[in-house]
Amino acid sequence: MEGSGGGAGERAPLLGARRAAAAAAAAGAFAGRRAACGAVLLTELLERAAFYGITSNLVLFLNGAPFCWEGAQASEALLLFMGLTYLGSPFGGWLADARLGRARAILLSLALYLLGMLAFPLLAAPATRAALCGSARLLNCTAPGPDAAARCCSPATFAGLVLVGLGVATVKANITPFGADQVKDRGPEATRRFFNWFYWSINLGAILSLGGIAYIQQNVSFVTGYAIPTVCVGLAFVVFLCGQSVFITKPPDGSAFTDMFKILTYSCCSQKRSGERQSNGEGIGVFQQSSKQSLFDSCKMSHGGPFTEEKVEDVKALVKIVPVFLALIPYWTVYFQMQTTYVLQSLHLRIPEISNITTTPHTLPAAWLTMFDAVLILLLIPLKDKLVDPILRRHGLLPSSLKRIAVGMFFVMCSAFAAGILESKRLNLVKEKTINQTIGNVVYHAADLSLWWQVPQYLLIGISEIFASIAGLEFAYSAAPKSMQSAIMGLFFFFSGVGSFVGSGLLALVSIKAIGWMSSHTDFGNINGCYLNYYFFLLAAIQGATLLLFLIISVKYDHHRDHQRSRANGVPTSRRA
C-alpha cells in the first residue's frame, strides 16, 4: 500500500512495482501448488457428480411407482433437500473452525455423505425397498384414493436425504475456502483464477452426472443409476485422503460464530443499558458521545468492553456483507427451479426418442437440459479467465463482484420470465392436443410442443451463474476478514439455502386449494390442470424488485469500499461513502 505521506512521484514507481508483482503472480499462480489444487478440484468434481446424480432425477424417482408422490410433493422434497445442504453450511464452518480443522471436517463429511448415499440404491432395489418402507404400504401407494396425498416411504427417503444433505453442507462450507487457502499467499489474482476453475470443475462434474447417470436412471435402472454416484462419493473420499500430504492445512483456532454471537449479544445489552441510563437522566453526556459511534464500538477494550479491536472490526465487516447475501435469496429461489419445476415442465413437453435398439425406446432424459447450463459455463469460464478478464483489467474496466452479481440477477429474472411464457403456451396447446409418453415407467400427458423450447431458460440461468454465482463466491471469500472466511462462506451458502426453502414454501403456498396454482390433486404428476406459469411470473417479479434494491445496496457498498481504500492509501476523496 502507498504511504499517506508520499507524493505523486513516490507513488508512481510503487504502483508500477505492484503491477509487475501482480503480473508475475498471475503467471505462476499455481506453481508448486498444482497437486494440492488438483486434488481439491477432483474431489469437488466427484462430489458434484454424486450430488447431481441424486438431484437430477429425484422428482422422476419419487413421481414414479411405487412411490407415486405428486409432482408438487416431489419438487418440495427436492427443494427442502437442497435448502438443507445450504442451511447446514454455517454448522459445517463452525465444526471446522472450532473443532476439527477444514481438512478433517471435509473427510468426516464425505464419510457421512457416503452413508446417506447408500440409502438410494437400497430404496431403488425391490428386494431391499420392502425392508425399508414396509411391503403393505408399498402395495397401496400406487392406487389413488383418499390417502393419495400421503408420501409413500417418506421416513426412509427423508432420512437418506438428511444424511446426504448434512454431508454436502459441511463439504460445501469448507472445501471452497480450503481450496483457496492453497493459493491465497499468491495474491488476489490467484484466488480469482482458482474460483474460476473451481466453478469449472463443479460444472464438469454436473455434465458427467447429467450426461451419464441421468440417462441410466431414466432408461436403464435407478438401482444402477444411484449406485454410480455412491461410488463417486467413495472415490472423492479416497482422493482427498491421499491429498493430505500435499495440502496446506491449519489447525482449528476457534469459531468466528462464537465470537460473533457474543459481540452481538454484548452490544445489544450495552445499548439497552445506555438507553436506561438516558431515560433516568444519568450519563447523558456519555450517551450522546457514544451515540456517534458504532453500535459495536462499546464492545472494544478501548471503550471498556471485553473484546479486542480486531474481533469487533471483523463483526462490523460481517454486518456490512449480510445485506448482500439477503438480496441474493430471490436469485437462489429462481436458480433452484432448474432441477425442480423446470423438470416438471420438461416431463409435460414432447420428449424425443434417442434409441430404438431396445424393446422399450430410450427417451432423452429431461435432466439433460440442465447440461445446456453446465456446458455453457464449461465453455465460457476458460474464455472469461484467459481472454475477457485480462483485457478488461488492462483497460481498468473489470467490474466489481457486486456489479457482476447484479448482471446475473437480471439474467435469472429473464429465465423465470421465459419459463412462464413457455408454460402459458404449453397450457394452451395441451387443451387442443395431448400426447401420452412414458418416462421412467411413468405415463405423462404432455403437450405436442418440443422439449427444445426450454433451452433458452436454461441458457439464461447458465449466463446468470457465470456472473452471480462465481462473483458471489469471490465476494464472500475476499470481503471476509481472514478470521471469518469459513464463517462467511458458510453464511453465503446458508442464504442460498434460504432461497431454496423460500421456493419450497412458495410452491406449497400456491398448491393449497384456495389458490390452486399448482397441485390439482387428481393425478400424481399432472400439471395440466395447474397454473405453473403464474408461479414463474411471480418469481420473475420478485427477482426484478430485488434487483432494484440490490443495485442500491451494491452502489453504497462499492462507494464505502472505495472510500476506505482511498483513506488507507492516503488519497483524498470527494465522495461520501
UniProtKB/Swiss-Prot annotation:
Q: State where the protein is found.
A: Lysosome membrane; Endosome membrane; Early endosome membrane
Domain of life, per UniProt, equals Eukaryota
| CDD domains given in the database record | MFS_SLC15A3_4
Q: What is its main location?
A: membrane
Enumerate the Pfam families for this protein. Answer: PTR2 (PF00854)
Q: Which reaction does it catalyse?
A: glycylglycylglycine(out) + n H(+)(out) = glycylglycylglycine(in) + n H(+)(in); N-acetyl-D-muramoyl-L-alanyl-D-isoglutamine(out) + n H(+)(out) = N-acetyl-D-muramoyl-L-alanyl-D-isoglutamine(in) + n H(+)(in); L-alanyl-gamma-D-glutamyl-meso-2,6-diaminopimelate(out) + n H(+)(out) = L-alanyl-gamma-D-glutamyl-meso-2,6-diaminopimelate(in) + n H(+)(in); carnosine(out) + n H(+)(out) = carnosine(in) + n H(+)(in)
The UniProt transmembrane annotation reads 49-69, 76-96, 105-125, 158-178, 194-214, 222-242, 318-338, 363-383, 405-425, 459-479, 490-510, 535-555
Q: Hey, what tissues is this thing expressed in?
A: Highly expressed in skeletal muscle. Moderately expressed in kidney, liver, and heart. Weakly expressed in colon and brain. Expressed in low levels throughout the gastrointestinal tract and in Caco-2 cells. Expressed in retinal fragment epithelium (RPE) and neural retina. Expressed in small intestine, stomach, duodenum, jejunum, ileum and colon.
Q: Which GO terms describe its biological process?
A: dipeptide import across plasma membrane; histidine transport; innate immune response; L-histidine transmembrane export from vacuole; mast cell homeostasis; monoatomic ion transport; peptidoglycan transport; positive regulation of innate immune response
A molecular function (GO) held by this record is: dipeptide transmembrane transporter activity
* Keyword list, A-Z: Endosome, Immunity, Innate immunity, Lysosome, Membrane, Peptide transport, Phosphoprotein, Protein transport, Symport, Transmembrane, Transmembrane helix, Transport
**PANTHER family, alphabetized:** OLIGOPEPTIDE TRANSPORTER-RELATED (PTHR11654)
Q: What does this protein do?
A: Proton-coupled amino-acid transporter that mediates the transmembrane transport of L-histidine and some di- and tripeptides from inside the lysosome to the cytosol, and plays a key role in innate immune response. Able to transport a variety of di- and tripeptides, including carnosine and some peptidoglycans. Transporter activity is pH-dependent and maximized in the acidic lysosomal environment.
- What name does the UniProt record give this protein? Solute carrier family 15 member 4
